[in-house]
Amino acid sequence: TGNRQTDCAQCPKATEGILVHRKFPKGQHFPPDKCTQNCILFILQGELLVNSEEYPGTTLREGQFILQSIGSKLELLALTDVNYVVYWFNDPPLICEQRYHEILQQSEAPLTYTPLVMTQRITNFMKDICDYLDEQMPCGAFIDLKCQELMYLIICYYPRPQLSKFFYPISSYTESFQYFVMQNYEKVKNVEEFAHLG
């Protein structure tokens, strides 16, 4: 594969922290921490123990992925050497908004949350995006396009009942006051300004 012929590090469009490729050795532990954004975690290799309200004591294996909503507490422990991608977002970039809104309207809390399994399309996407992320600082505009593609691959290639359970944490959270606070706290300087937003 050819390498990028431009140096994106100096470009104002360069960005980090939206799609993140991570590798950790067995035993690496991340104590419980509140998610400041929604995230989808894709396991590429190894096993990762996840502990959260939605996925208590759940072992994620290669090819599986889960969603954690903004405000949820997430703890991670690498049971083996692990390789995974995290996608951080507030509002998902949508190509097919109608289907996404239909999914959210029909979403219901599952008795137990089950990780989704990557389709071949998502597996191929992950291989390509990891090669790209490992090269150098990513281009923000390109990452935005890839995130649209990724959400399209999730929203349009899985059955709606599966997706309505998968996205339930977002649908329930976006209706809450805490979500309103998290989405707006950077926009205001004091409580009085905050009151005017409501």
Give short role names for the model-derived ranges.
Residues 50, 154-158, 181:
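Hydrophobic recognition helices of helix-based DNA-binding modules
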Residues 118-131, 147, 164-189, 193-198:
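A short, Lys/Arg-enriched amphipathic alpha-helix from helix-turn-helix/homeodomain DNA-binding modules
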Residues 44, 155, 182-186:
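Short, locally clustered residues in the helix-turn-helix/winged-helix DNA-binding domain
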